[in-house]
Amino acid sequence: MNHQDFLVEIGAEELPPKALRQLAEAFAQGIRQRLEKAQLSFSELTWYAAPRRLAVHVSGLAEKQPDLEVEKRGPALQAAFDAAGAPTKACEGFARSCGTTPDKLEKLETDKGVWLVFRSKQAGAPTTGLLPAIVEESLAALPIPKRMRWGARRTEFVRPVHWIIMLFGEKVIDCEILGLKAGNTTLGHRFHHPAPIEIATPANYKDALKNTGYVMADFEERKALIRQQVEAIAKQTSGMAVIDEELLEEVASLNEWPTALMGRFEDRFLEVPAEALISTMKGNQKYFHVVDAEGRMLPYFITVANIESKDPQQVIDGNERVIRPRLSDAAFFFSTDKKRTLASRLEDLKPIVFQQQLGTVYDKAIRVGKLAAKIAAKIDSNPEWAQRAGELSKTDLATEMVMEFPELQGTMGRYYAAIDSEPEEVSMAQEEQYLPRFAGDQLPTTLTGCAVSLADKLDTIVGIFGINQPPTGAKDPFGLRRAALGVLRILVEKKLDLDLAECVQWAQELHGDLPAENLETAVVDYMLDRFRAWYEEAGVPTEVFLSVLARRPTKPVEFDQRVLAVAEFLKLDAAQALAAANKRVSNILSKEQVDISAESANPELFTEEAEKNLFRALQEKSESARPYIEQRNFTQALQQLAELKDVIDLFFDKVMVMVDDPAIRSNRMTLLASLRHVFLQVADISLLQNKA
């Protein structure tokens, strides 16, 4: 079968930079999936993306689908011919439907008899006839929240489309895509080469754009070049560029022909907190900043221009003129904010509503302060610092700087608290209250920061659950999932042995009357269930998590200790047998409605040696496991209990539990209940059956 290269390019007005990679990858994936579904073989598929284009190059694409052997089954042989061997009407009708005659039909022998069949070869469709639909379907499936129309056209896309390339080998595919006639010409750089460029073959696409059109279509190549240029130009200052990956991705999406240039700003702006300077440079201007060897900010910025200027200094001067007033604004906000203390701004929070049913941001700050103090007392921190930090925690929201740059909340609070001569941990807690912001983010470094972060998150979770607005499906407007996971991470990774149930009670009391019923149970259950995704990501079997959840330990540190112990237990040779035995015991006790307890069986009622052995071994291992359980060394406790495997197996081999004598039967039930109780002190091992 012959093969050709295929190229599709969608030429548009500037595409959304933050969505460019996603659009390109989705477009390529859509084409890949549809080619595979159409059984069109190919050797390689590559995507290209630049501000004004999305393209996919498919190498070695088959010129047509493979031919198919088609088998159509007709009537049974006995119904196809009469006694004289002449075709029946059923046979003739089947032959006509297949476009043939009865003598061309074949026989198919099956377990259910012999049937007439018609076999034919269906020629594969030519690729050029299939590609337009494949491309259109792939475009229609792109993740575009809002599509737009342009001109008098009815077609829709993320941005107006001005040209289309559909090239198979050296031939243009005769079709319309998004209302435009496909061709083999593209456009180069908007300023360097606005004239059309003819693409002779798909393989020439990348080089033709680069060598003639001043366009680097390869996204990763462009991104690597920007990184290289930015790092090189920063060395001219004896400093180094800080390359934020998210910013680099966006800058690569904004430029077709990137050229890095360095500008300078006045040293006086370095008196402003670096985060504020970075925020305006990165957020508004898409600049990279420069630091010295100690990480201190230097008065330089690096911009990436989408043009190779004959007078680069003019471009630099223009950027310096743009950034100067923005930095001046930041300096003004900082100077103005310093004239008032954070404490004096607490009253400014009273008009700001946190949530209609939960009061103002002022109310929340007071609650957070009181809850943080209670938590601090439990974790051997300073309750006074925690309460002070909690009360001040939202005051920077009323500052000019944070109102202009909301992303600096907490960060500016830290600076302003330090300027106000607050204790260092109080200052640090202003920023650390928001940690962790996302999965994998750093945690608070101070105990005061931990206390305030926990208090802030718990106050929100309890409050929102308390007014019956928990997360539903994909909707989580208050970020409760992230907050709950943040609480668990702080408690587990910082080894803070707090009881969630107790903390939720405190938060509930500080909120006052809340309409939700069974609030404490609902919140604790919700938070413990966040562990599910945590352990899945860590590679811990879900059954291990469920075995611990069944016991519902409400201290996250202890919950984690139990999970890790059960995960180790699962590696033991005896694990599966013990899990099966626990399951069997659980079923027996459940069927007979026997309560699980530590009550000891009466040894005088034993009649079988196997039950006597189990009784003695259970007493011995319960005693040896008890100190480990009290010390929460659950790994060692389970290793002790694992030694019961042989006596448990022998018990079930030799002893009939459901005997006629009620006293003996009840005594054996009590023995099994105590066995079940011993394991349940760690986890419900019965849930681990066949999960090793």
UniProtKB/Swiss-Prot annotation:
E.C. designation(s): 6.1.1.14
Any GO molecular function: arginine-tRNA ligase activity
One GO cellular component, as annotated: cytosol
UniProt catalytic activity: tRNA(Gly) + glycine + ATP = glycyl-tRNA(Gly) + AMP + diphosphate
Organism: Hahella chejuensis (strain KCTC 2396)
Highest rank taxon of the organism: Bacteria
Primary site of residence: cytoplasm
Location of the protein in the cell: Cytoplasm
Entry protein name: Glycine--tRNA ligase beta subunit
GO biological process: arginyl-tRNA aminoacylation; glycyl-tRNA aminoacylation
Pfam families for this protein: DALR_1, tRNA_synt_2f
Family membership: Belongs to the class-II aminoacyl-tRNA synthetase family.
Keywords from the UniProt entry: Aminoacyl-tRNA synthetase, ATP-binding, Cytoplasm, Ligase, Nucleotide-binding, Protein biosynthesis
Subunit and interaction comment: Tetramer of two alpha and two beta subunits.
